[in-house]
Amino acid sequence: MERGMVTAISLLKSSNYRYKIIEAIGNETLTPSEIATKTKLRLNHVSMFLRELKENHLVKCLNEESRKGRLYELTELGKDAITKLTKK
């Protein structure tokens, strides 16, 4: 398993919030508010963890320049990591 994948899986396993956010996004493109609603997490927590997930290349923001209504989706690394974690 490559180093990036190991880091991604470790990051997701170490926080239930990160895992919930990645799982909520899945194959969709969502705003932080939509993610907060789906996960029942507070919006400020969602925003904080999205920033962290973006820094680790698990999610990407499609409209970085927008102040409101930013859209997030999983990167290939994020999709691969969640697939590995849910595979039994």
Provide a role label for each language-model segment.
Residues 16, 27-31:
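Short capping segments at the starts of secondary-structure elements
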Residues 23-27, 86:
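Short, locally clustered residues in the helix-turn-helix/winged-helix DNA-binding domain
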Residues 56-67:
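Beta-hairpin "wing" of winged helix-turn-helix
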Residues 66-85:
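Basic, amphipathic "hinge/linker" alpha-helix immediately C-terminal to the N-terminal HTH DNA-binding motif
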